[in-house]
Amino acid sequence: MEQAHTKTTEECLAYFGVNENTGLSLDQVKKNFDKFGPNELPAEEGKSLWELVAEQFEDLLVRILLLAAIISFVLAWFEEGEETVTAFVEPFVILLILIANAVVGVWQERNAEDAIEALKEYEPEMGKVYRSDRKSVQRIKARELVPGDIVEVAVGDKVPADIRLISIKSTTLRIDQSILTGESVSVIKHTEVVPDTRAVNQDKKNMLFSGTNVGAGKAVGVVIATGPNTEIGKIRDEMAATEQEKTPLQQKLDEFGEQLSKVISLICVAVWLINIGHFNDPIHGGSWIKGAIYYFKIAVALAVAAIPEGLPAVITTCLALGTRRMAKKNAIVRSLPSVETLGCTSVICSDKTGTLTTNQMSVCRMFVIDKVEGDVTSLNEFTITGSTYAPEGDVQKNDKNVKAGQYDGLVELATICALCNDSSLDFNESKGVFEKVGEATETALTTLVEKMNVFNTDVKSLSKVERANACNSVIKQLMKKEFTLEFSRDRKSMSVYCIPAKASRAAVGNKMFVKGAPEGVIDRCNYVRVGTTRVPLTSAIKDKILSVVKEWGTGRDTLRCLALATRDTPPKREDMVLDEATRFIEYETDLTFVGCVGMLDPPRKEVMGSIQLCREAGIRVIMITGDNKGTAIAICRRIGIFGEDDDVSGRAFTGREFDDLPPAEQREACKRASCFARVEPAHKSKIVEFLQSFDEITAMTGDGVNDAPALKKAEIGIAMGSGTAVAKTASEMVLADDNFSTIVAAVEEGRAIYNNMKQFIRYLISSNVGEVVCIFLTAALGLPEALIPVQLLWVNLVTDGLPATALGFNPPDLDIMDRPPRSPKEPLISGWLFFRYMAIGGYVGAATVGAAAWWFMYADDGPNVTFYQLSHFMQCTEDNPDFEGHECEIFESPVPMTMALSVLVTIEMCNALNSLSENQSLIRMPPWSNFWLLGSICLSMSLHFLILYVEPLPMIFKLTPLNVEQWFIVLKMSFPVILLDELLKFVARNYLEG
């Protein structure tokens, strides 16, 4: 049923053809069940494991590697002799890499789908329903409820479906609907019509929503929506419809992969074509097919050389290390790639309650009446420090600390706060914090009494558990609470009836203490308290009191004000009818006004500094809240989102005002605004969409079920540690301490991680460029193979992987939070950098080929062939006069390969040192600025020695141990790469950067 909140109860009952007392007939139940289905959220149609695995192989680079593995497997099948073992190592290793990558990918995808399942925990198990087959109420499974059912709910129940209230069977009905609307206090419901067809869920006071909790009272209503049609069901649909976007880094790596795969394909084809003339060379036994297969192998080697197989593992490791560092700062990261996205966050949309504020109501101002002379009324105004529930803070008058017990008015005010109150403080020993037990507003009064300590109780020697309610207990020993007149909407107040405790023997009679909305309470006051006397309330005094209340309620702080009053001579208990709430207002008359307190949910202390940090880092902060606009703007001013005197027109909107704008202006509003109040979940998603259309990278915080769709849609969803499981599973990050400042620390960490990733991605890619150049040169010049696929895999995975991982530990730049966020479109490798890699890669390739050629042509223990003989080695036969005096076997010696591989590895170690900083010289950033890197270089070299000197590894890798002279040549050929890169850095620093 649509718009049920705008219909009368009779219209709702008539719509479903149901009688309030008997409920639906079994025929109607069956018909509605067939029509609307069970009252549960449909299970998420997740992808099957097979589909998830298949998805991991959609990446082009992965497919090229897979193809390379299949080809080398087929070729290995036809090998004979001792080659066979080596031949099978390569396809086996490639497959292992692919499997490992797929496992990580599938695991992350699986995590993403848990969010929708977590909604299930808000589904109630049972419901209490009236149906015509039984006289009394019956308990049935909640999934069997249908629209039209008459349902009963009572305190402690979870609301089983969306319900339109028909009648309330208690004084009040309070519902905690914070999971759905984000309201920090429970809401009082009624049964009257809410005529506004565009009311937000917060304003539908005659509706109960599925999954919310009944805090107090008992009521009967008619089910108007079940399952997917409920408000919580709509949230599920929205989440299911939200596609996860790829992070900026993932998009870049995808683009890079596509370009790389095109380049690889071109080079492979080119190598093949260049050598078509050699297919018939004698070395292949004159068989054209064998020649084709030989060059096919080289093409496979090229593919393996060009793909940085170690990259996914190194990225995952770096992100995982980043998440550990963030966890120490209270930011728990749930999805690894989002660590890097945090670094380019340009807008943070933050919830107000609990994130920017403490979500601990606290009284910050109060007044009692000082004196009344004729028409002139003077007040004693006080401010109170401390912004949490901890009973620590001072009472100040004119910025000087005062003792509250010296003011008679404050003693009575404290008495009312302590007695007219059902809440208390509790010290949670495991968390080490003071927490509320009961309503936030009342707990603020309890805390106020502790701070005032009007009877000078000795609290210094008490433990924290005893301290929590020490001063309140003293007051409760003087007066005993007999009964409470519950709060009701019509009178907007509550009261308690108290009698003096026997022990106190005080000369006071019975009293009624009242607290409530100032306008309503003052209307029922006939007197005001001045010191210990009471003075008749004149219109001048009343105007003075109301003007201060209005100023507090609408001024800079927009405080929530409560008036406190006493009925000095209440009626006798036996004359009061306590089961008729409508008569309570008669007993709360002839009151004496005592004072007024103003409270707010205060901003966290550290938030102001964080917002300043965001401003310097070029990040915009937008506050989004379900609270009203006045309160929201006041908090924005207090924390520095708005200046004290800023004009906020066009910069702060309510959800309704935002909806009233045409789409073009809504777009503009999202560009300018810094505050959205009275917002529904759908607005949050809309705001994220508009921000994304300006290419902003948005972080969105939330804690309720209602926030889940927006959390899922934003690039970075941030849930609160104290929030609902749904919010946590829909988000990328969870704040363990619910603190806004933690987000800013996480953004800083994200920026540092991205800078380091850029360094090691570039490092790994320059290594691959070198390998490709090496293979291309040997093939183009017709030289013997310098590197084979097994060796390339070893270098890419192991020897390069270790320093690359260590580069993730580079210390962050000092000015990292003074720069604007990087654009997500900024390429990983710009034009100049591309040239640098080509230059370095070209040198790496030339040096490796050079090392192999050196052994053939110049080494003392080498064959000393000429360059012509080397480049035509394929035509070597015993009867070819060009090769007289040389055995053809020398061209298959493992020494030149070992030389080439050693040069490659050593150059890569030098390159790792070059990567310590993008443009800083090694003189400015010495190697010991990153000890992890030095350690990993030593480890990589040790592993290289391992495959040269420890049997049977040299056989598998087709290598042989080198002597001292050969190592000398290796070092001579490797070190110039440092000089070359220093030169390129010098050019970048002095001619390109400014």
Swiss-Prot record:
<feature type="topological domain" description="Cytoplasmic">
    <location>
        <begin position="809"/>
        <end position="828"/>
    </location>
</feature>
<feature type="transmembrane region" description="Helical; Name=1">
    <location>
        <begin position="49"/>
        <end position="69"/>
    </location>
</feature>
<feature type="binding site">
    <location>
        <position position="351"/>
    </location>
    <ligand>
        <name>Mg(2+)</name>
    </ligand>
</feature>
<feature type="transmembrane region" description="Helical; Name=10">
    <location>
        <begin position="965"/>
        <end position="985"/>
    </location>
</feature>
<feature type="binding site">
    <location>
        <position position="800"/>
    </location>
    <ligand>
        <name>Ca(2+) 1</name>
    </ligand>
</feature>
<dbReference type="Pfam" id="PF13246">
    <property type="entry name" value="Cation_ATPase"/>
</dbReference>
<feature type="transmembrane region" description="Helical; Name=4">
    <location>
        <begin position="296"/>
        <end position="313"/>
    </location>
</feature>
<feature type="binding site">
    <location>
        <position position="515"/>
    </location>
    <ligand>
        <name>ATP</name>
    </ligand>
</feature>
<keyword id="KW-0067">ATP-binding</keyword>
<keyword id="KW-0460">Magnesium</keyword>
<feature type="binding site">
    <location>
        <position position="908"/>
    </location>
    <ligand>
        <name>Ca(2+) 2</name>
    </ligand>
</feature>
<feature type="binding site">
    <location>
        <position position="678"/>
    </location>
    <ligand>
        <name>ATP</name>
    </ligand>
</feature>
<feature type="binding site">
    <location>
        <position position="796"/>
    </location>
    <ligand>
        <name>Ca(2+) 1</name>
    </ligand>
</feature>
<feature type="binding site">
    <location>
        <position position="625"/>
    </location>
    <ligand>
        <name>ATP</name>
    </ligand>
</feature>
<dbReference type="Pfam" id="PF00690">
    <property type="entry name" value="Cation_ATPase_N"/>
</dbReference>
<keyword id="KW-0547">Nucleotide-binding</keyword>
<keyword id="KW-0703">Sarcoplasmic reticulum</keyword>
<keyword id="KW-1278">Translocase</keyword>
<feature type="topological domain" description="Lumenal">
    <location>
        <begin position="950"/>
        <end position="964"/>
    </location>
</feature>
<feature type="topological domain" description="Lumenal">
    <location>
        <begin position="274"/>
        <end position="295"/>
    </location>
</feature>
<feature type="topological domain" description="Cytoplasmic">
    <location>
        <begin position="314"/>
        <end position="757"/>
    </location>
</feature>
<feature type="region of interest" description="Interaction with PLN">
    <location>
        <begin position="932"/>
        <end position="943"/>
    </location>
</feature>
<dbReference type="GO" id="GO:1990036">
    <property type="term" value="P:calcium ion import into sarcoplasmic reticulum"/>
</dbReference>
<feature type="active site" description="4-aspartylphosphate intermediate">
    <location>
        <position position="351"/>
    </location>
</feature>
<dbReference type="InterPro" id="IPR001757">
    <property type="entry name" value="P_typ_ATPase"/>
</dbReference>
<keyword id="KW-0106">Calcium</keyword>
<dbReference type="InterPro" id="IPR023214">
    <property type="entry name" value="HAD_sf"/>
</dbReference>
<feature type="topological domain" description="Cytoplasmic">
    <location>
        <begin position="1"/>
        <end position="48"/>
    </location>
</feature>
<feature type="topological domain" description="Lumenal">
    <location>
        <begin position="70"/>
        <end position="89"/>
    </location>
</feature>
<dbReference type="GO" id="GO:0031448">
    <property type="term" value="P:positive regulation of fast-twitch skeletal muscle fiber contraction"/>
</dbReference>
<feature type="binding site">
    <location>
        <position position="627"/>
    </location>
    <ligand>
        <name>ATP</name>
    </ligand>
</feature>
<dbReference type="InterPro" id="IPR023298">
    <property type="entry name" value="ATPase_P-typ_TM_dom_sf"/>
</dbReference>
<keyword id="KW-0479">Metal-binding</keyword>
<feature type="topological domain" description="Lumenal">
    <location>
        <begin position="778"/>
        <end position="787"/>
    </location>
</feature>
<feature type="region of interest" description="Interaction with PLN">
    <location>
        <begin position="788"/>
        <end position="808"/>
    </location>
</feature>
<keyword id="KW-1133">Transmembrane helix</keyword>
<feature type="binding site">
    <location>
        <position position="771"/>
    </location>
    <ligand>
        <name>Ca(2+) 2</name>
    </ligand>
</feature>
<dbReference type="InterPro" id="IPR044492">
    <property type="entry name" value="P_typ_ATPase_HD_dom"/>
</dbReference>
<comment type="similarity">
    <text>Belongs to the cation transport ATPase (P-type) (TC 3.A.3) family. Type IIA subfamily.</text>
</comment>
<dbReference type="GO" id="GO:0005509">
    <property type="term" value="F:calcium ion binding"/>
</dbReference>
<feature type="binding site">
    <location>
        <position position="706"/>
    </location>
    <ligand>
        <name>ATP</name>
    </ligand>
</feature>
<dbReference type="GO" id="GO:0033017">
    <property type="term" value="C:sarcoplasmic reticulum membrane"/>
</dbReference>
